[in-house]
Amino acid sequence: VTRALVNGLPLPSLLVDLLAAHRWCHPGDAILQTVVPWIKDPLVFLPSLKEMAIASQWELFIEDPDFAAFIHYARGAQSVTPMELPWLDVEQAIFILSSQWPGDDQGVALDYRTSRTDPRVLASDWETTHACLWREVTPTFSAFVQQLGL
C-alpha cells in the first residue's frame, strides 16, 4: 500500500479516502463557523496533495526569527524543550485549509506531534492577541471530519 505523503508526513487514511471520493470539500460557512469559531475570514479546503504541499512551505516564514515568533512558527528539531501550543512545529504540520484571500494568513493544519495516523487539528488564532497563536480545533483529524459532517 502506497502512503500519501506531504512534506514527508503521511496523510491520515481518512483524508486520503475523502480526497479520492471528492468529499473533502467545504461544508458551508455556518458549519465551519461552529467548528472553528475564532476564524472569521473565508477558508478554502485544499483539494490535493500538491495544494497542501504548496501551502505547507514554511521556509520563507521561518528564516526571519522576528516574523516566525510573530506567527508562532518554529522547528521542533531545533528546540531544546518540547514545543507546545501556541507554537506550530512546522516540521510536524501540514496545512489542510487556507485563507481564501491571500494575506489573510488564516489556516487549519494537521499537527503530527500527537499522532502519525490521526493527528490533531490546529487553527490560527488572530483574535485573542496581537500575534498569531495556534489553537486546538479537535484532538484528532477523525473528530474534525465528524464535526464537519463530511
What does each model-found stretch correspond to?
Residues F95-L97, D105-R116, A123-D125:
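Low-complexity, glycine/alanine/valine/leucine- and proline-rich hydrophobic stretches
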Residues P82-E84, S98, A109, T129-C132:
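Short, flexible coil/linker segments at or flanking structured domains
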Residues P27, I31-V35, Y112, S124-W126, ...:
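Generic preference for flexible, low-structure residues
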Residues L122-L150:
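Compact, glycine/acidic-enriched structural inserts
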Residues V80, R113-R116, P139:
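Intrinsically disordered/low-complexity terminal segments and short unstructured peptides
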Residues V1-G103:
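A surface-exposed partner-binding patch
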